[in-house]
A protein has these predicted regions:
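ANL superfamily AMP-binding
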Residues: 5-22
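Conserved sugar-transfer catalytic core signal across GT-A, GT-B, and GT-C glycosyltransferases
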Residues: 7, 11, 33, 159
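PLP-dependent aminotransferase-like
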Residues: 17-77, 81-100
Length: 232
């Protein structure tokens, strides 16, 4: 069975990535992408994200390009397509290929139902910052990720504990940016990536959820006012 990692490895090979090259990847991601880059002998270079889409920021990629850059891997995060148009402008200026990665092949009906559920939540949730799709982007909502305003990770974690106590399963989608993980430990400041790790929370969203289950999520969140007393 061909895995997403296998597919990316093949794409890097087709793009001509060789040992000693650099490949720009998001740090707001699982470590697998960076490890695939290492597996072909190249060096992952981490760039920041757009705070709305959680996908690679074209401006950050622009600053990360060097004469060793051989490719950019644009991960489609949580089902939101990366901005391949803006990244394409960077690609043309520097003659560096951009490889889209991470969109899952799913039944159209399941995606449509998730989008309808996401619309329901977005219209009713209060006090949290709900996800927004870029204009013309088709968000697949593989995860429904909100931001908990306040004092970063302490407030996000307290909010999550309070939701779980009310029977709502939720989780931080990413705890540690890849550039700060034990495998890499890069001395690099990626402000939006780090802020997203501290503020973001994935709420339940599945194609087979009922309206009653969705309303339970809304009621639990809104009962907290969307924001707990900021942590000390």
């Amino acid at each position: 069975m061909v895995t997403p990692a296998d597919e990316l490895r093949c794409e890097l090979a087709r793009a001509g990535v060789r040992s000693g090259d650099e490949v720009i990847v998001p740090s707001y991601d699982v470590c697998e992408t960076a490890h695939v880059v290492l597996s072909v002998g190249a060096e992952p270079v981490f760039a920041d994200i757009d705070p709305v889409t959680f996908c690679l920021s074209a401006a950050s990629v622009e600053t990360a390009v060097t004469d060793r850059t051989a490719a950019v891997v644009a991960v489609h995060t949580f089902g939101h397509p990366a901005d391949l148009a803006a990244l394409g402008d960077v690609s043309r200026r520097h003659r560096v290929p951009v490889l889209g990665h991470g969109l899952e092949a799913e039944p159209t009906a399941a995606i449509a139902r998730r989008r309808a559920h996401a619309q329901y939540l977005t219209a009713r949730l209060k006090g949290v910052r709900t996800p927004r799709a870029q204009r013309a982007a088709e968000h697949g909502y593989q995860k429904y990720v909100v931001r908990v305003p306040g004092n970063g990770r302490p407030d996000r974690d307290a909010f999550a504990r309070a939701l779980r106590a009310r029977g709502v399963d939720c989780q931080a989608p990413l705890l540690t940016p890849v550039h700060r993980s034990a495998a890499f430990r890069r001395e690099l400041r990626l402000a939006e990536t780090e802020r997203a790790c501290d503020e973001s929370l994935a709420l339940p969203l599945a194609a087979d959820m009922t309206r009653r289950e969705l309303q339970r999520v809304v009621s639990a969140c809104n009962a907290l006012g969307g924001l707990l007393q900021p942590a000390g």
